[in-house]
């Protein structure tokens, strides 16, 4: 039987055709010839109709292209049907697939790698993965610039068959084929003039200018030795740019500046914020020091040991832990400080005679939460009580 999968890649601009039905089983239909593209190689299945019935899926099964319809058809094997491939979706898939070769060509030039890590066309974006030898990254603006240059240079796109052994011997050819295609005697080559040569079975445009604009949405490292580029093409790319411009305009209006000055304004605000954070940290340290001094003058005796217990405001447990040991150097044998940082916490420091973990355990047994640490310094958190109640529970009646 003739393998019908490659009619769409060979003649990707065909949208309407008539074909005889080879087999019909429920909602699944096989035609003698078809221009529907079955899902594969990262490209989604075509959409469209057979005799007006919606085609909801197209898959390659045992060498045949199987069309799954939304409803059981009224035709049988041997009948001739009128088929229509959804023009908008096929055109988008063609643009997206050729754009992947453009972006991949740019990535290879920047990364110096031939590694192909995967590809997928979704409705809102396209994903392309590069395999690398180690840590690597790509500048999204550089990739975007290079891709759009190839688009407006209107480079021809050609496809042809090549002997598989000859193709495999060429280092400049990238392979993006399934196991069956890769094992064939010949492979289909897609070539963008002076830019990229790949073995590929997808549908493509004839010239890069048909892709339209390319907008790089994100560059990430989803795994070891892998770089991922996500991008949009055509109308979707324009929509992304408009949304980016809209957000930039809103941000500029909020910051009372122009879009062109957003970066410098953001840097200025970050510097101001860091300065304020430093001032706040210094002030908090001073307040904590003053609070520790005041608490050191109010000791009490418990189990034959001198204790200090009190509350602190405006600081977290780590900041308290950094300073609480100062009071065990002479003011007290055991120091307990409670505060709030989302929930109530307690920090305990001792001179070693009393285990700080035992004190934290006493508090968490009564008020919940958990914690621990070293014999001379421990913390507890998630307490179901306010700091004042925690401190009061430790003082002798």
Regions found by a protein language model. Give the residues of each.
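A glycine- and charged-residue-rich anion-binding loop/surface
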Residues: 1-397
